[in-house]
Amino acid sequence: MKLIVVAALIGVCAGGALPGHVAPQYYYGGPGYYPHGRPSPGVERNAAILRSDSEVTSQGFQYVYDTENGIHGEAAGVEANGIQSQGAFSYTGDDGQQYAVKYTADANGFQAQGAHLPTPPPIPDAIVRSIEENARAEAAGVYNEGSYNVYNNQAAFANRHQYPYQYQSNRPYNTLGYHGYKY
């Protein structure tokens, strides 16, 4: 009996944690390209808040915050035709570059501006000339909506009603439902 107890005690002690092996700490950074979260350094998870000021009144709101890892954010807004706000935020990217974004959000949507954000390509000269020509013609009272206008195209209207749909009464009633299943 003593032998069984000693063997069990040795087995429990030998089955303990392995020295030098540390279980990895996983951090979920939210949805995105990385299916298991964005890899991030430990400092980012535990960054202290250096400044956090906020005020909410019946006229609107404003807030400002700073963290020790270089993240800064500020915004102010009022309630008029929905919420109209403007603000900015900045942070240091994984590549060490400082990224800054200024934005407005109102009835026209969210509009962000930043040096690192993509910009649309320029409008081709031919399109610009065409828009200017259309504006001049409209100012002169010429309205050319193109050669096709469904409401003024009598031939298209006549062809559409040439063969009216007729109900076929000699067809048996369909007792089968959707995809052939009986109800």
Curated annotation (Swiss-Prot):
It comes from the Eukaryota. Residues 1-15 form the signal peptide. Residues 58-121 form the Chitin-binding type R&R domain. Pfam families: Chitin_bind_4 (PF00379). The keyword Signal applies. Transmembrane segments: none annotated. PANTHER family: CUTICLE PROTEIN (PTHR10380), CUTICULAR PROTEIN 47EF, ISOFORM C-RELATED (PTHR10380:SF173). This is Cuticle protein 2. It comes from Lonomia obliqua.
